[in-house]
Amino acid sequence: MDNVENCAADVFERQAAFLSSALPYMQKYENETVVVKYGGHAMGDSTLGRAFARDIALLKQSGINPVVVHGGGPQIAEILMKMGIESRFENGLRVTDERIVEVVEMVLAGSINKEIVALINAEGEWAIGLCGKDGNMVFAEKAYKTVIDPDSHIERVLDLGFVGEPVEVDRTLLDLLACSEMIPVLAPVAPGHDGKTYNINADIFAGAIAGALEAKRLLFLTDVPGVLNKKGKLLKELTISEVENLIKNGTISGGMIPKVETCMKALQNGVEGVVILNGKTPHSVLLELFTEQGAGTLIVS
């Protein structure tokens, strides 16, 4: 019995020590905006989903203004398959035609968005699900992707259909929600001035939102620990110039390149710091914001 009591006392002591050490960081972020892009493996794991919702609720209860932006690529692919809708790809990128963009909006702004809202509300907070259409928050225009043919070296423009990029962000509605103690949960769907609906990459959408809000932090929850060096070791902090050099020497490659490019653009648009961290680690948001060592790679100007 003594051993059990001693173990319990040790656990409580560690918990108390964590809470005490977290206080300066809570004060640092009080009344600040933190945008969290939620995606990857964590979205498909119910335990991680509940932990994420609890983290977001705790941020709000600590006086921080959290804004959640979510993705949903795997869920969209699953619904398209169930509906018997075949996807066409250009250079590995899905072409979003008129029929598919309707499904995208249904899945992102509907089922996924409301599921996240429900998880946060279950933790005692007041979350509200929105997309770029609500309150004319975000306007998009058609995005074009250019590729270079490896044989002819001729540049070719890909038409990906209703894939867009944000060109205007109005923060008015988000500011009103912050004043109302509400937590916005945003789906990356937005209208164009042409009256069409566009599906936007969730990372890019989160970067645009964070820039418009001049967020203290933009957190990207991914399936990797952060930016790694060539030996596989986590790089804890980088500047824009260091990131550019790591791209040039091949340390940053593949799918990490567009992610860090989004990070750099967000910094140039007024975000103070951007963090790439592992969403598969329970409570990674709290570990990043409320501990000295953080939980991922911090990129600053």
Curated annotation (Swiss-Prot):
Sequence positions that bind substrate: 72-73, 94, 199
Residues with site note (Transition state stabilizer): 37, 259
Pfam families registered for this protein in UniProt: AA_kinase
Broad EC category: transferase
Cellular location(s): Cytoplasm
Gene3D superfamilies per UniProt: Acetylglutamate kinase-like
GO cellular component, one term: cytoplasm
Pathway participation: Amino-acid biosynthesis; L-arginine biosynthesis; N(2)-acetyl-L-ornithine from L-glutamate: step 2/4
GO terms of biological process kind: arginine biosynthetic process via ornithine; L-arginine biosynthetic process
Enzyme Commission no: 2.7.2.8
Record GO terms (molecular function): acetylglutamate kinase activity; ATP binding
Reactions listed under catalytic activity: N-acetyl-L-glutamate + ATP = N-acetyl-L-glutamyl 5-phosphate + ADP
Keywords: Amino-acid biosynthesis, Arginine biosynthesis, ATP-binding, Cytoplasm, Kinase, Nucleotide-binding, Transferase
Domain of life from the UniProt record: Bacteria
Role: Catalyzes the ATP-dependent phosphorylation of N-acetyl-L-glutamate.
Stated family: Belongs to the acetylglutamate kinase family. ArgB subfamily.
Protein name as catalogued: Acetylglutamate kinase
Species, as recorded: Bartonella quintana (strain Toulouse)
